[in-house]
C-alpha cells in the first residue's frame, strides 16, 4: 500500500497555512440562504436516504454474522402422527401387540424439550467473517459520509454558480439601461441630421447583443435551479424564492502536512481502506475453511411414541453429539473461494493506492488554481480602479456641463465589464475553494472503529 509519507504536495505549491475544514464548512461564507439549502439537502435528498439505508443494511448483516459465533438454543414441541409400514425399517412397530408395547400401525409421537448447538471457532473462520462484516459496515459508514460530502459540495457549487449568474444578469441589465440611453441619444441626434444612420444601427446592434446575453443568462439561471432542485430533492416551487445574495470569498489555507491526516480525513479513502481490511479478513476466513471444524449438539426433553406416556419418567431423553468434520473432496470449492478472496484483496489494495494518489492530485490541482486566482485578483482590482477613475472623471465633466449625459453614461460600460471580470474571478475562487474543501475531506474525521 502507498506509504503515507508520500502523501505530500510539490514544493512549488505555496499557499498560506490553515486548519483542516470544519464539519459545517459552508458557514464560512456567511450566507443563511446557503445554510438552509444545505440543511434541506441533507434532510431530503434521495441519495442521502439511500446511503443511510445501506449503513443499516450493513449493520444488520454484521449482527447476523455475529449471531453465528454464539450458542444457538431452541425450544421444541412436536406431535407426529405416524402410520408405520409393515415392510419398512420400522416394520415391527406396524403390529398391534399390546403385550410387547406395540399399538401399530398408527402412533402419535410427542416430543418436548430444548436443544442447543455450539460451533468451536478453533481456526478463526467465524472471527474472520465477523471482522469482514465489520469492515463492510465501516465502509458503508464512510460511504455515507462521502455521499454527504458530495451532496454539500455540489449543492454549494450550484448555489454559487446561480449567484454568479444573478450578479452577471444585474450587471448586464445595468449595461442595457446605459445602452438604451445611448441609443435614444443617437436617435435624437440622427433625427436632427447631426449623426449618420450607420452609427445609430451600430449602437442598436450592441443593445440587441446585450438583450441576448440577458436572456441567455436568465435561461442558465433557470437551468441551474432545475439541476439543484433534482439534486436536493426539492419540489417544483421550493427554489422559486432563491434570491440574489452577496458573494463573499474567504481565505482558505492549506494544512501544514497531509500524510496520515489526509488518509483519515477523506471519507472515500476510508471507504477504500475498510474494503481492504474486509478483504483481508475474507482471505483469512477462506484459509480457515480448509481446517477441521468442531461442534457439539445437545438435546434434553421428553420423547414418547404415545402422547399419553409423554410426561412419564421413562420418556426422558438426553442427547449429546460432538461432531468433527474435515473437508476432503469438495470439487475445488474451497480453493476457488480462496483464490477469489485473494483476487478481491489484491484488487482492493490497488484501488486504494490509486485513490490515495488521486486524492493528492485533487488537493494539488485545487491549490494550483487558487494560487493562480490569487495572483489574478489584485491585477483585476487594479484594472477596475483605473476604469473607475475614468468614469468618475466623466461624471465630473457631465456635472459641469462639459460632457453629454449619453457620453458620460457610456464611459460607465468599461467599469461594468471589469466588474464582470472580477465577479468571474471571485466565482472561480469560491468554486476552487469548495473543491479544495472536498479534496481535504470536508471536515470528516475517521473514528477508526
PLM segments and residue spans:
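Sec/SRP-type N-terminal targeting helices
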Residues: 49-50, 66, 106, 120-148, ...
Amino acid at each position: 500500500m502507498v506509504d503515507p509519507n508520500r502523501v505530500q504536495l510539490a514544493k512549488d505549491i505555496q499557499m498560506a497555512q490553515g486548519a483542516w475544514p470544519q464539519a459545517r464548512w459552508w458557514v464560512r461564507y456567511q450566507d443563511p440562504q446557503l445554510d438552509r439549502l444545505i440543511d434541506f439537502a441533507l434532510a431530503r435528498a434521495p441519495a442521502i436516504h439511500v446511503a443511510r439505508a445501506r449503513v443499516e443494511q450493513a449493520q444488520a448483516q454484521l449482527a447476523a454474522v455475529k449471531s453465528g459465533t454464539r450458542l444457538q438454543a431452541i425450544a421444541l414441541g412436536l406431535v407426529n402422527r405416524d402410520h408405520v409400514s409393515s415392510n419398512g425399517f420400522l416394520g415391527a412397530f406396524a403390529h398391534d401387540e399390546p403385550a410387547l408395547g406395540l399399538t401399530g400401525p398408527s402412533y402419535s409421537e410427542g416430543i418436548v424439550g430444548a436443544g442447543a448447538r455450539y460451533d468451536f471457532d478453533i481456526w478463526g473462520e467465524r472471527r474472520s467473517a465477523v471482522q469482514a462484516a465489520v469492515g463492510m459496515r465501516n465502509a458503508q459508514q464512510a460511504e455515507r459520509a462521502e455521499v454527504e460530502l458530495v451532496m454539500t459540495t455540489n449543492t454549494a457549487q450550484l448555489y454559487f454558480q446561480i449567484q454568479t449568474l444573478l450578479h452577471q444578469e444585474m450587471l448586464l441589465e445595468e449595461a442595457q439601461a446605459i445602452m438604451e440611453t445611448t441609443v435614444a441619444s443617437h436617435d435624437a441626434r440622427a433625427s436632427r441630421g447631426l449623426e449618420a444612420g450607420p452609427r445609430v444601427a451600430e449602437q442598436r446592434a450592441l443593445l440587441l447583443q446585450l438583450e441576448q446575453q440577458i436572456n441567455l443568462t436568465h435561461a442558465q439561471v433557470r437551468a441551474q435551479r432545475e439541476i439543484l432542485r433534482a439534486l436536493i430533492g426539492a419540489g417544483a416551487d421550493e427554489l422559486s424564492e432563491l434570491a440574489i445574495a452577496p458573494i463573499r470569498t474567504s481565505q482558505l489555507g492549506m494544512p501544514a502536512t497531509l500524510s496520515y491526516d489526509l488518509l483519515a480525513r477523506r471519507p472515500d479513502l476510508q471507504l477504500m481502506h475498510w474494503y481492504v481490511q474486509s478483504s483481508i479478513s475474507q482471505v483469512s476466513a477462506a484459509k480457515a475453511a480448509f481446517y477441521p471444524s468442531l461442534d457439539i449438539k445437545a438435546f434434553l426433553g421428553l420423547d414418547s411414541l404415545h402422547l399419553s406416556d409423554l410426561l412419564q419418567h421413562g420418556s426422558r431423553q438426553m442427547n449429546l453429539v460432538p461432531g468433527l468434520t474435515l473437508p476432503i473432496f469438495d470439487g475445488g470449492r474451497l480453493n476457488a473461494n480462496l483464490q477469489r478472496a485473494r483476487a478481491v484483496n489484491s484488487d482492493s489494495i490497488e484501488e486504494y493506492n490509486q485513490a490515495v494518489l488521486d486524492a493528492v492530485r485533487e488537493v494539488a490541482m485545487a491549490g494550483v488554481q487558487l494560487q493562480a486566482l490569487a495572483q489574478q485578483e489584485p491585477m483585476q482590482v487594479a484594472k477596475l480602479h483605473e476604469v473607475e477613475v475614468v468614469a468618475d472623471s466623466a461624471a465630473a465633466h457631465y456635472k459641469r456641463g462639459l460632457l453629454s449625459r449619453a457620453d458620460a453614461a457610456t464611459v460607465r460600460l468599461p467599469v461594468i465589464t471589469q466588474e464582470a471580470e472580477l465577479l468571474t474571478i471571485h466565482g472561480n475562487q469560491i468554486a476552487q475553494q469548495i473543491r479544495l474543501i472536498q479534496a481535504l475531506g470536508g471536515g470528516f474525521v475517521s473514528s477508526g472503529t
